[in-house]
Design a protein with these regions (language model features):
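Active-site beta-alpha loop architecture of Rossmann-like, nucleotide-cofactor-dependent enzymes
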Residues: 68, 130, 159
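S-adenosyl-L-methionine-dependent methyltransferase catalytic module, highlighting the catalytic core
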Residues: 6-39, 97, 133-141, 151-281
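A short SAM/SAH-binding and catalytic strip from SAM-dependent methyltransferases
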Residues: 122-133
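Conserved N-terminal segment of class I S-adenosyl-L-methionine
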Residues: 1-116, 122, 139, 212, ...
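Short, cationic motifs built from Arg/Lys/His that form the positively charged side of catalytic pockets
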Residues: 144-147
Length: 291
């Protein structure tokens, strides 16, 4: 993940502050396997499919502690791996898990990447666009560092999609899922699939494949996860209520994490889905890039 670290972020109607140097918010720990039959494995599998036949230099923007890059070391050892993130703490963890220095990590903001133009054959983002203050600028940077003909693959939680649990709860005061995700994980953009496709296409990134995940079960999983985080963050909530929230959320969280994987492998439609996996190719023609 990446955003403007420790600065106030204007989300449209209020100022919001999120700390990416908090160890509790670091993403990307551990490693992934394609056979673990969960939502993280689904993202990895779809990414690997998107990159079949591509070689050279790969950059992951918003790499966190490096989970996806470590997985690529196993599944795609032929690639030269690079990662950047805005969090010093996340990169410190990534480097600690990179003793031989085979992955090149850099501190960098998605809105101002520390790389030359046309440097990478592949660029990846997982759960990044919803964190940045300017989605178009982040897409500009992707297009800038990606070589013509190169592949861009991303996963975006498009929580503004219609006919989803998130759309039903959009203005809910009882279950304000959008506020919970903003406060606890830094989601400051509520995007839609069409918005993302349009933003990428206008920057010369031709969308060649779009698939979907996080259908109903995945969203139920999310709601209970962030409800628990909200309850546990309140100092005035009694301990017994916090314990109850943990028990209830775990009872939902554990089965839905795996059941959602099977749901997403069966359901191909965009109906009721908020998870969007996009694969693009950078056009060769300089004139293809539109503002």
């Amino acid at each position: 993940m990446t955003a403007v670290q420790n600065k106030e972020q204007n989300t449209g109607n209020e100022q919001f502050r999120f700390d990416y140097e908090d160890t509790k918010t670091v993403e990307g720990r551990g490693a992934l396997r394609t056979d673990s039959h969960d939502l993280a494995a689904l993202r990895l599998s779809r990414c690997l499919q998107a990159l079949e036949g591509n070689t050279g230099k790969l950059l992951e923007i918003g790499c966190g502690a490096g989970r996806y890059l470590r997985s690529f070391q196993h599944y795609r050892p032929d690639l030269e791996l690079h990662g950047c993130d805005i969090s010093h703490i996340a990169l410190e963890e990534a480097e600690n898990a990179n003793p031989n220095g085979s992955i090149d990590y850099k501190l960098g903001d998605a809105l101002n990447l520390p790389y030359d133009d046309n440097r990478f054959d592949v660029v990846l983002l997982f759960d990044v666009f919803e964190h940045v203050t300017d989605v178009g600028k982040a897409a500009d940077e992707v297009a800038r560092v990606l070589k013509p003909g190169g592949v861009f693959h991303c996963f975006v939680p498009c929580e503004g999609n219609r006919k989803t649990i998130f759309s039903v709860l959009r203005h809910s005061k009882l279950i304000p899922i959008h506020r919970w995700k903003r406060d606890h994980i830094g989601h400051i953009q509520i995007l839609t699939t069409r918005q993302m496709q349009s933003i990428l296409e206008r920057r010369g990134l031709k969308v060649t494949n779009t698939t979907f995940s996080f259908h109903i079960l995945g969203q139920i999983h999310d709601v209970f996860d962030y409800w628990q985080r909200e309850v546990l963050s309140r100092d005035w909530v009694p301990g017994w209520q916090k314990l109850g929230a943990k028990v209830i959320s775990k009872a939902v969280f554990i089965p839905t994490w795996r059941l959602a994987y099977y749901e997403d492998t069966l359901l191909k439609s965009n109906r009721a889905a908020i998870g969007v996996h996009l694969t693009c190719v950078k056009r060769d023609e300089p004139s293809a890039r539109q503002k």
